[in-house]
Curated annotation (Swiss-Prot):
The gene is RSC1A1. Residues 150-159, 170-180, 460-473 have a biased composition (Basic and acidic residues). The lineage of its organism: Eukaryota, Metazoa, Chordata, Craniata, Vertebrata. Residues 1-16, 83-99, 133-144, 474-491 have a biased composition (Polar residues). Mediates transcriptional and post-transcriptional regulation of SLC5A1. Inhibits a dynamin and PKC-dependent exocytotic pathway of SLC5A1. Also involved in transcriptional regulation of SLC22A2. Exhibits glucose-dependent, short-term inhibition of SLC5A1 and SLC22A2 by inhibiting the release of vesicles from the trans-Golgi network. It is found in: Cell membrane; Nucleus; Golgi apparatus, trans-Golgi network. Residues 1-48, 71-99, 116-189, 433-493 are annotated as: Disordered. This is Regulatory solute carrier protein family 1 member 1. GO terms for cellular component: Golgi apparatus; nucleus; plasma membrane. Interacts with YRDC. It comes from Sus scrofa (Pig). Keywords: Cell membrane, Golgi apparatus, Membrane, Nucleus, Transcription, Transcription regulation. Transmembrane segments: none annotated.
Amino acid sequence: MSSLPTSDGFNHQAHPSGQRPEIGSPPSLAHSVSASVCPFKPSDPDSIEPKAVKAVKALKASAEFQITFERKEQLPLQDPSDCASSADNAPANQTPAIPLQNSLKEAIVADNLEKSAEGSTQGLKSHLHTRQEASLSVTTTRMQEPQRLIGEKGWHPEYQDPSQVNGLQQHEEPRNEQHEVVQQNAPHDPEHLCNTGDLELLGERQQNQPKSVGLETAVRGDRPQQDVDLPGTEKNILPYGCFGCSSSETFMEIDTVEQSLVAVLNSAGGQNTSVRNISASDLTVDNPLMEVETLKCNPSSEFLSNPTSTQNLQLPESSVEMSGTNKEYGNHPSSLSLCGTCQPSVESAEESCSSITAALKELHELLVISSKPALENTSEEVTCRSEIVTEGQTDVKDLSERWTQSEHLTAAQNEQCSQVSFYQATSVSVKTEELTDTSTDAGTEDVENITSSGPGDGLLVDKENVPRSRESVNESSLVTLDSAKTSNQPHCTLGVEISPGLLAGEEGALNQTSEQTESLSSSFILVKDLGQGTQNPVTNRPETRENVCPEAAGLRQEFEPPTSHPSSSPSFLAPLIFPAADIDRILRAGFTLQEALGALHRVGGNADLALLVLLAKNIVVPT
């Protein structure tokens, strides 16, 4: 390969025309704008000049840039056609990364360099840190040049189509030399583009401070020794066309002392490198986005497909938002993506009692809890049907309603909760024996271990001796009442059911009256003979039996009044009359009238939720 000597005494590598120096670089990284440095490894550590000499060269280069700008900033902007023609006149065999040698501007610089080198370098400092023992050279950023726009002002590298960038890479010409972005002041290796352990910090520049091509050409001509080969990821996004100049933002003072050097441990090579932090003075508040990417360069010019994220990167205090580049540069999971705002909080689950989702969720939780063995294995779970006849002294009519065994006091009890309060029982364990002898005179079942609290836990239930299919009683940590499964013999069953939660087999997750049932969780029910002249142990009033529900009355058999259960405080239960259409709808779904009435009572007349309760009874949670 040929080398082109420059005024700084170093031979810069010359690439053939059309050849890209970033061999192996992923095309998707071409959107990045170089905002920092790419260190290079010198081929011979002995060729590195002493630090003092390099510092002098850096100061002289700064002086050249300032002098050139002061001379050229008053010049009119160059026409785009002039820019294109001057760029097209570049030699065809010169690499796109090497600036044009302008002898006229070099003479101007040489004439003025010694006169104002010391006075014009104030505010522009550059410190070169050299590690000769490790053969690593970390170059510092010369200046943060204003953002350039391609063609028109609306161009932004983030929104540019990848196909346009690919076309730019394929048809790039030597005039790219006049639009290089990064100025570097350290020698580079003609044989190696980048060191293995070096990282390159890429970021967006300001978009609203363009610079004229005339000034750019002047700067390139005055300081050819400061221009080095750039990776394709920096070069391919360089704009064409004419640029404006902002005199107020001419120089962005770069004080490398204020810039933080972030030490990044290279996991592949194990070498410590330094990446340059973007100074706060290089960013303005109106710059909404800054893409930060680090690229790992190796001697074989192969770039790491996943950019290494710099964890210790310190950002300026201005409102700069770091955005991920997965969409722009392909799927790079290591891309640095920092958000200025925290993630939105997760919405809380809907606590509405009428929500089917909440009902199913509650059902699942209760079934999982109830699957734990908390009680002795009971024999069978059946459905209780109760007829509550509460005859008021004024206008309370005789009523008969059916209740499933585990149903709670619902809206009917809500109306009377000011008179009677049912408190949650802590523990009720009811174990009943199944009566197989059809000649049992009383037909009662033994009720054991009844421990409940609250004034309303002693109510009785009227149970129908209809055989029920066996359900999973091992899942239930609550009370299950066993009915005598005799054919024609009436039996009296006394039982107290406690539902601290919901009964596993039958309780759907219906919390429509969850607030009420928390304080009314002890299920009432009443087993009594509805014969004439019998006294209700709950209300202590005489009561008569009327056929309020004809179908239920047809199936009802007389039960002997219980003698072992004490009477509790009075309870006035106002019934709910449900629409026939809702009952028919549940019956058409394959459920019995008893189940339909019980479910409607439980959910306060909501047919949808009642149907859901009945369907949820069939859910079995595997243990």
